[in-house]
Regions:
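Alpha-helical coupling/stalk and coiled-coil linker elements that connect catalytic or binding modules
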Residues: 1-432, 439-469, 491-492
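ATPase nucleotide-binding head domains, primarily ABC-like/P-loop NTPase cores
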Residues: 376, 382-603
Length: 603
């Protein structure tokens, strides 16, 4: 197992190798650019100077200047592509170095997925700035980004599914080169959020040209007539001008379809770059050996060796690129006059669509799954000190040793344990302000979520039964719905009760129940709620300032345990250990802090 220092050294080495090669490529680009300019100037000057020397001399000048100039264009373009590739390679390794120091600002934060009504994601800061999503997200496609959000928002609750995903993540964790290659190729052209829907909609759209017999026959008819005219002209039966007149007629006839084809080309043209990206990603998946069942399944989604998905998509990309040649007026006139070339290309594209439309969604799904699994594997690779949880079938169980919050600096994070071994069972945590209650709840929630999506967790060890996670930590007012803070929380608690009564299994995390009412009412309601949880065989953690809730452990000695986070007052100073201790809190700090700030407090 690598250490953090070894992982840091690996990223530094790859970035440095990239910078070294990039410097060489940039020098080549400069030299080739200079050579192209020299050849172009020499060619033009030679043609002008030797214009009257005959076609043999001019042909020789073109052969030694302009032809090499054209050949160098292709090589120059390859160098620019390599430059883009190396810049992405350097960037992603520099980003990982920053991420190891908890700077994830360069990654997308998934703020568009924030949902205050979600069962747990809003409370646990799963999406948004400085979120779990931003910390994990290494997706290089919009497909993968959306799927990662989906996985974080709808975690697994099946033991076999979680263990299968763990196996896939373990396998990819050791494949650093594959993961980085996948990410680089995806980032070269990431596309936009609507690409997937637009491609699927196009795949389902009708084939207007291919379904029409007239359009299918037109290229064959025009081509046959032109060949016949050329043959007759060569035989001296008809003058060549007949062929020329027919050719012009076909060119003008093609104008009748120009508007419709231009609209179709505009749609296709937007997909060229993203299709090329998808083809590259699919080819990478096809060539990667897979061992775990999930990765083998992803591989099966993209076809067999005889007709691979990458080859099929590359063929479509080639057809669309050929259609783009109609923008060249000379090619447009020449080929359309010969055999209605653009109609032929549209028919070929529609033929591809009819052949592979049913396969396209599976191919896109394969890309998305591999993208997300690579993200999760990078998370595992960057945290060699994390452990994969043991998934149990014993309901309910949640045991973890030395558990910390993954977004907190590893050198400053105070780690604590948790131990729930039966159903029903609740942990009630009391403590002063700022003592660590809320952080502990989020630590438990985030690690529980990580375990249920198949990744390692920030703990020395963990064992859990995967029930549905639900929280109520930061209920807020809703001005749009005319809802008070208190009523919003009641709706949340009602949701939990209804689902428990329906027989659903939950792991519940609550912070300060019934915050929006007076102390006596709050206490009475909180006691009643927890008693109902016991009746419904529920499990969870509740943090509170209300020490009276600690008396519930006397009523349910086997089902409720008290823990606390203390604020220690020594002399005139307030200190926090952030260590979870057994029992009910002894010290509260509100009055102490008010006095420290000069606010009068009557003893």
């Amino acid at each position: 197992m690598n250490t953090i220092n070894e992982i840091t050294a690996t990223y530094q080495r790859i970035a440095e190798e990239g910078r070294s090669e990039l410097n060489k490529v940039q020098n080549k680009i400069y030299r080739i650019g200079s050579l192209r300019l020299l050849l172009f100037v020499a060619g033009i000057a030679g043609i002008i100077y030797f214009w009257s020397s005959g076609w043999i001399v001019l042909t020789g000048i073109i052969a030694v200047t302009l032809l090499p100039f054209i050949l160098l264009i292709k090589y120059h373009n390859r160098l620019f592509h390599r430059k883009d590739y190396l810049e992405k390679k350097i960037a992603i390794n520099e980003q990982e170095l920053s991420a190891l120091n908890y700077d994830t600002s360069s990654f997308e934060d998934g703020a568009e997925f924030i949902d205050p009504a979600h069962l747990y994601s809003y409370d646990l800061d799963v999406f948004g700035p400085h979120s779990l999503f931003q910390y994990i997200n290494r997706t290089c496609t919009q497909l993968g980004k959306s799927l990662l959000a989906n996985w974080l928002g709808t975690h697994l609750v099946n033991k076999k599914e979680i263990e299968s995903r763990q196996e896939a993540i373990r396998e990819l964790t050791s494949e650093l080169n594959f993961r980085q290659e996948f990410r680089i190729l995806g980032l070269l052209y990431k596309g936009k959020a609507a690409d997937e829907d637009e491609l699927k909609a196009w795949a389902k759209s009708p084939s207007a040209f291919r379904k029409n017999v007239f359009f299918r026959m037109l290229p064959l008819l025009a081509g046959g007539i032109n060949i016949l005219c050329i043959a007759l002209a060569i035989a001296g039966i008809i003058p060549l001008t007949v062929f020329g007149i027919l050719w012009l007629c076909f060119v003008f006839a093609s104008f009748c379809f120009t508007s419709k084809i231009t609209k179709m080309q505009a749609v296709y043209g937007k997909k060229l770059q993203i299709l090329a990206t998808y083809a590259n990603l699919l080819r990478l998946i096809e060539n990667q050996p897979m061992k775990s069942p999930i990765l083998k399944e992803v591989r099966e989604w993209i076809g067999d060796e005889k007709q691979t998905a990458s080859h099929s998509i590359q063929r479509l990309s080639k057809l669309m690129n050929e259609l783009d040649q109609r923008n060249n007026a000379y090619i447009y006139a020449t080929l359309n006059g010969l055999f209605f070339w653009e109609i032929r290309k549209i028919i070929q594209i529609e033929g591809w669509k009819e052949q592979y439309a049913s396969e396209l969604p599976r191919w896109l799904t394969a890309i998305a799954h591999m993208d997300v699994l690579c993200s999760l594997a990078t998370f595992a690779y960057n945290h060699p000190d994390y452990s994969y949880p043991i998934i149990t079938t014993r309901s309910f169980s949640l045991r973890a040793a030395s558990m910390g919050h993954p977004l907190m600096n590893r050198d400053k994070c105070v780690r604590n344990d948790i131990d729930i071994e039966k159903r029903p069972f609740f942990i009630i945590i009391t403590g002063a302000n700022m003592a660590g209650k809320s952080t502990y709840l989020r630590t438990v929630g985030i690690n529980y979520l990580l375990a249920c999506i198949g990744t390692p967790v920030c703990a020395r060890s963990m064992e859990l039964y995967p029930a549905q996670l639900i929280t109520s930590l930061r209920t807020s007012d809703s001005l749009n719905d005319n809802e008070s803070y208190f009523f919003a929380e009641l709706k949340r608690l009602k949701l939990i009760i209804d689902k428990l009564q329906a027989g659903e299994e939950f792991f519940i995390i609550l912070d300060e129940i019934l915050k929006g009412t007076n102390s006596m009412d709050k206490q009475k309601g909180s006691l009643a709620l927890i008693k109902q949880f016991m009746t419904l065989q529920a499990n969870g953690i509740i943090a509170t300032h209300d020490l009276m809730l600690g008396t519930l452990a006397d009523i349910y000695p086997d089902d409720i345990h008290n823990y606390r986070f203390e604020a220690d007052i020594t002399g005139n100073e307030l200190t926090f250990s952030y260590r979870l201790r057994e029992g009910v809190a002894q010290n509260m700090n509100a009055c102490f802090l008010m006095k420290k700030m000069g606010i009068a407090v009557t003893d």
